[in-house]
């Protein structure tokens, strides 16, 4: 696990984008993508570059259950707004949170991942150590699954909604085993509220109580942190 300390989120996005360009030069064709505020500067770098994404495939980590894609808090909307409208990919996959049969959708998404192995996976990290929507206690062997979101996650995401009651209570998430199958993982974390999770991920025991700690067992992880997020590291 390589730690890169940066001044701020802007620099973090630039560093992540430079790592992406290196991976693409080495033949990467499938990107695993994340949502939320953390990767926005990475997407800005991508959008402002001359990179042609028309031969690339993207697979997103997760999607809320029950939000229409035209809702501006759906991850489908987020990805179009932040990246895909400006940089179309050959194929872009997201879980379908409106599927009538969620278990069938989970199986479909696992098949998508199996057919398009991820070369370069972007991650954020939750305050409770979640990656994707894999909450504490999620088995490391889990593949794509339907998640009941923890109260802390619902509260953290409530700032994006008119009321906490509007925050979806479930999501479909790529599983920890799916994430770990990625060839390279780049995890971004900014802000003091991520410091404890970063410390546990980097130097704590590998435990399902802190999902991100499993990344200690991956061969190619780069962690990009600002000073606040790195403040509890030695």
UniProtKB/Swiss-Prot annotation:
Active site (record annotation): 62 (proton acceptor), 128 (for ring-opening step), 130 (proton acceptor), 135 (for ring-opening step)
Pathway: Amino-sugar metabolism; N-acetylneuraminate degradation; D-fructose 6-phosphate from N-acetylneuraminate: step 5/5
Reaction catalysis annotation: alpha-D-glucosamine 6-phosphate + H2O = beta-D-fructose 6-phosphate + NH4(+)
CDD domains cross-referenced by the UniProt entry: GlcN6P_deaminase (cd01399)
InterPro entries per the UniProt record, alphabetical: Glc/Gal-6P_isomerase (IPR006148), Glucosamine6P_isomerase (IPR004547), Glucosamine6P_isomerase_CS (IPR018321), NagB/RpiA_transferase-like (IPR037171)
Disulfide bonds: none
Domain of life: Bacteria
GO biological process: carbohydrate metabolic process; glucosamine catabolic process; N-acetylglucosamine catabolic process; N-acetylneuraminate catabolic process
Cellular component per GO, a single term: cytoplasm
Similarity-based family: Belongs to the glucosamine/galactosamine-6-phosphate isomerase family. NagB subfamily.
This protein's name: Glucosamine-6-phosphate deaminase
Organism annotation: Streptococcus equi subsp. zooepidemicus (strain H70)
């Amino acid at each position: 696990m390589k730690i890169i300390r940066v001044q701020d989120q802007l620099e973090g996005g630039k560093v992540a984008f430079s790592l992406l360009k290196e991976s693409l030069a080495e033949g990467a064709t499938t990107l695993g993508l994340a949502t939320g505020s953390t990767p926005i500067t990475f997407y800005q770098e991508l959008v402002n570059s001359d990179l042609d994404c028309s031969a690339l495939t993207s697979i997103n980590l997760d999607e809320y259950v029950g939000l229409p894609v035209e809702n501006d808090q759906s991850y489908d909307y987020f990805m179009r707004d932040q990246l895909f409208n400006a940089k179309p990919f050959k194929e872009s996959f997201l879980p379908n949170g409106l599927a009538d049969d969620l278990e069938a959708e989970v199986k479909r998404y696992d098949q998508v991942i199996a057919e398009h192995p991820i070369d370069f996976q972007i991650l954020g990290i939750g305050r409770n150590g979640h990656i994707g929507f894999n909450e504490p206690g999620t088995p490391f062997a889990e593949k794509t699954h339907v998640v009941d979101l923890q109260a802390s996650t619902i509260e953290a995401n409530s700032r994006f909604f008119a009321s906490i009651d509007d925050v979806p209570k479930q999501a479909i998430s790529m599983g920890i085993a799916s994430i770990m199958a990625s060839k390279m993982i780049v995890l971004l974390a900014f802000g003091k509220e991520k410091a404890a999770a970063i410390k546990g991920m980097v130097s704590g025991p590998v435990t399902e109580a802190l999902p991100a700690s499993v990344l200690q067992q991956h061969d190619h992880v780069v962690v990009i942190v600002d000073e606040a997020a790195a403040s509890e590291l030695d």
